[in-house]
UniProtKB/Swiss-Prot annotation:
Alphabetized SUPFAM superfamilies for the sequence: Phosphoenolpyruvate/pyruvate domain
UniProt signal peptide: none
Gene3D superfamilies assigned: Phosphoenolpyruvate-binding domains
Organism (species): Gluconacetobacter diazotrophicus (strain ATCC 49037 / DSM 5601 / CCUG 37298 / CIP 103539 / LMG 7603 / PAl5)
Top enzyme category: transferase
Protein name as annotated: 3-methyl-2-oxobutanoate hydroxymethyltransferase
Positions with a binding annotation for Mg(2+): D44, D83, E114
Residue span of region Disordered: 256-276
Family affiliation: Belongs to the PanB family.
Length: 276
């Protein structure tokens, strides 16, 4: 049975930490579900992690639907949340149209929107229409040209604004909120003030749960990972080694072997070659 937003919300008073992870395709969704990840995020971060863009801004609604549909097909238990991408919810009408497409065409169970009090009316309207919404505050990548890619809300006024935004989203009906790259102390204070779950990324250990990017925690990309990510494996190195071995065996003629080949009866081959 699939996890519901009510199950997720019940984890907070029960003291159960929520593990959330991005997934962008069918294989990653299958593996994440087998590992027991309760909530998967089809983030617009796929623009960078999968498509090679420098930002999330080029990601379209069609991109999100295509990837989210694949993730949903790979799950039967995990709650699947999808981002609405840049400027697809600038107005209430846009948000409703975008939400309808993603919910109907991809089959996700919830949507994530970036922004605070300014989008609270949109969040309220979507929830009234039966669309579960997760908020996203702090570093909001769709606003990186105005906010920058840095830790947010270090100063008192900014911190107060973030808390007010979180309360506004909760009041509008958001079932949970992601806090990205905010000071640990502030994230913990917001988590304590809210009744809904707060899921952190680069926001310290005081949140109700954590979300991380698939590629970061598996070490798929060479070089240094983001500071907030722990590399639980070095899958990228393992893949590279396997590919080198494949190239080497093809070039040396040691692959394929008899084990990877099929045979036919000699007389059948003869009849085929000599047929007029």
């Amino acid at each position: 049975m699939r996890i519901t937003l009510f199950d997720v919300q019940a984890m907070k008073p029960a003291g159960q930490r929520i593990a959330m992870l991005t997934a962008y395709d069918h294989p990653s969704a299958v593996l994440a579900e087998r590992a027991g990840v309760p909530m998967l995020l089809v983030g617009d971060s796929l623009g960078m992690a999968v498509h090679g863009f420098d930002t999330t801004l080029p990601v379209t609604l069609d991109d999100m639907i295509r990837h989210a549909r694949a993730v949903v097909r790979g799950t039967s238990r995990a709650l699947v949340v999808a981002d609405l991408p840049f400027l697809t919810y600038a107005t209430e009408a846009d948000a409703i149209a975008s939400a309808r497409r993603v919910m109907q065409e991809a089959g996700v169970q919830a949507l994530k929107l970036e922004g605070g009090a300014t989008i609270a009316p949109t969040v309220r309207r979507l929830t009234e229409l039966g669309v579960p919404v997760m908020g996203h505050l702090g570093l909001t990548p769709q606003s990186q040209h105005t906010l920058g890619l840095r830790v947010q809300a270090r100063q008192a006024a900014e911190a107060r604004r973030l808390l007010d935004d979180a309360l506004a989203l909760q009041d509008a009906g958001a079932f949970a909120i992601v806090l990205e790259l905010v000071p640990t102390e502030l994230a913990q204070a917001v988590t304590r003030r809210l009744q809904i779950p707060v899921i952190g990324i680069g926001a310290g250990a005081g949140c109700d749960g954590q979300v991380q990017v698939w590629h970061d925690i598996l070490g798929l990309f060479p070089g240094k990972s983001p500071r907030h990510a722990k590399r639980f494996a070095e899958i990228g190195t393992a893949i590279e080694d396997a590919l080198r071995a494949y190239v080497s065996e093809v070039q040396s003629g040691t692959f394929p072997t008899e084990a990877q080949s099929s045979r036919m009866k000699p007389d059948e081959l003869s009849r085929a070659l000599n047929a007029e």
